[in-house]
Amino acid sequence: MSTSTTRRVKLANLAPDFYKALIELDKVSDTGLDPKLAHLVRIRASQINGCAYCTDMHSLDLMEFGAEQQQRITLLPVWREAQKYYTEQEKAALQLTEAITLISVDHVPDDVYEIAAAAFDEKDLAQLIALIITINMWTRVGVTGKMEPGHYKP
């Protein structure tokens, strides 16, 4: 990991139209999905992409649903070994999140897609895919801009 102190451009200031469009996209990316599921998806993609800011932000958001969420957040990187803490829909969503986030590894395998398609109706599946794509954009903004955790307040 780089410890460079190179100043990074702030997209919010220098590409404001893009940044505003991303904010608007984010507002509709989880429409109709369970908020806890949506935050788990955001956290998992953020962990995979190494975005500390996004991981912190969405963990804090999920904690707003109660202290019992802490264990689910803690176990998220190893959710396959801790399946009893996640619903069937959440497990399907997490598996799809990992496939889409790591798309260069194996694209989105048919079996992963089929599990998600069985767990969600078509509209919610489309919304889930939109959410995963959106958080992946945000994590790239956060990592590229070296956004630091600890500044977000729910």
Task: Please place each PLM-identified region on the residue numbering.
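Hydrophobic alpha-helical segments
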Residues: 1-154
